[in-house]
Amino acid sequence: SSSTFLNTEVLRNQIESITIEKNNIVPSDAKYSKDISSKQDGSVMLWYTDKDNNNLYEVSIGGKNGSVEANTIGSGMFAYLENVDTLDLTGLDTSNTTDMSHMFRDSKKLTSLDLSNFNTFKVIYMNNMFYNCTSLTKLNLNSFDTSKVVYMNNMFYNCTSLSKLDLNSFTTSKVTTMLGMFNSCKKLSYIDLSGFNTSKVTNMQSMFYNCEKLENIDLSNFDSSNVTNMSYMFDRCSNLTSLDVSTFDTSKVTNMNAMFAYCNVLETIYVSNKWNTSNVTSFNNMFLNCTSLTGAVPFDSTKTDVSMANYTNGYLTYKASSN
């Protein structure tokens, strides 16, 4: 947070707003300006003002033709802006950006982000993109093209104020890791994952960990045939009453540690004959504190490991797979 912003003299924690301007003409009331163009030809200028005299700056970035082209590597570009509550990025051209990891990380005052103008066609990295954006309540990602994205781990980690997330436009056919993707999204009550293709995903560890307001998760289109790690996946989803994972093929999964732990109101877990735990080697506390769970037998606090992860004499309930 005390690092400088885009190699200028201004510190990230001294900024209160950022706007992409329509031109690169520096106004007379600017306290500071710098050429931040890659060619150092003045085509992209950054300047700041302090109109309310509070020692926090209003930063402007202006391009010659009204557009500012982001670098190929946009990692951390707007990260650690701990006093910024307004980001107007409508003039930012991201068409050549491949890395958006950590892009808004720890910008804890941001309440809304409209990224409807973002071109994400070339982006491969979206991991940690909104990590710890704890005040974010509105996030428009409808225009996102995620067809080339491989990394989505911790993408929305600890976005504790988000109550709904519509990701039905997401294409995830190349994504290999969703580790911690929605970890600790504690207010999330609605999530649309209907567009998700998870056929290449190998890691779903802590994917919905601590999503304590989620009452329902539709995972009917999930393909888990390449997943090896499902540990803590639904751990502390304390509002889930039923969970349908009947489409899950778990034949490659080796780690199911605490997969359903502390789901204390969860009554039913539906699985199909695709459910296979023969390769699971880590299974501690898999059903810890699942006190409401009943399958073939009711929950017994002395039996919380993978031996109960079946529908013949365990805690699971059979349902034919829909895919």
Residues covered by each model-derived region:
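Negatively charged
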Residues: 1-323
